[in-house]
Amino acid sequence: NSQTILVTPPGFSAYQNYIQQAQQSPYWKNALYDGFSLPAQGQAKEYCKKWISYGCDNVKQHPNKQHYAEHTLKSCKVAFCPKCFESWIGRQANRTTRRLSKFLESREIRKHYKFRHIILSPPNADKMSYKKLKRNLDFTLKVANIKTCAIVFHPFRFNKDKSIPVRSPHFHLLVYGHVTNTTEFYNKTKWTIKNKGDLKTDKDIFSCVRYLLSHCGVRKGTHAVRYLGDISYRKLKVEKEGHIP
């Protein structure tokens, strides 16, 4: 049977395009790699995206003797949820931005370094397990002299309109510091590095991470964003953000 593919409206950003396809492309549902799937391909809970109202009619204790009511849009904030995955993306992108921003504040005396978005692609990766890929990545990072970075795993690449995922595992990194990209690096690893440019502001970091999470690999028990080096959980403590309904 033929499948209906939605055409992307003019003016859509790449992020909006991925969000639309996550919700509506029939091909995303069947994209699987070593336990990883794509965002929004699970089941929503009964309360997801429903308005919940709380109230108190103890008017004697209220200013101006008025009733009190509060309305909240409920969200499970889970990557697999077709209704709430954007809430998960926003919260995770905000957490990553705050972590990287706090690290940069502590490095104020070295302003010439910003986080840089790079893509690391291994050879013949479609037949490797994630465990083996991760082990090879660790070696590759050492050869490239990458110590401090945030890592987002992408099991798939996509066709032009982002509707059809094709298995092609690779890693997106937000890297701090100098990256060694030489002939020697390629000869030792056979991995390729693609430099996507510096992230100059917090907004750049947030937009980049949000975009990456819109079509990343998600798997229960595995962090969608991994932090290494000086931004790791062990080395950098960041206060939790306030409550988001």
Which residue stretches match the model-derived regions?
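Conserved, short, structured surface segments that act as functional micro-motifs
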Residues: H170
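Right-hand nucleic-acid polymerase module
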Residues: N1-R167, G177-P245
